[in-house]
Amino acid sequence: MRLGKPVPHYQEKFPVGTRVRVKSRQYLEGFRRDWKYHHPISTEQIEAAGVTDTVKGAAFYHGGDVLYTLSATPGTWHEVCLEAAS
């Protein structure tokens, strides 16, 4: 509890160890264009479009945005930029 209020429970969509795929280049370019807040994605991340990797870690930005690190693909990844690998 903080100031008499319970701490919100955040839940990531992709737990550590989950195989994920970075979404398409078109999606990532649109995200970079439209996203105006924390952790903008880089050109290096856009080059990783379509890559499959494993979730190394998940963290929560203030307000509940889920941010991931991947095992072999650099950058901090927004949950909406990833999808389950089939």
How should each PLM-predicted stretch be described?
Residues 2-86:
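Basic/aromatic-rich interaction segments and small domains that mediate binding to polyanionic partners
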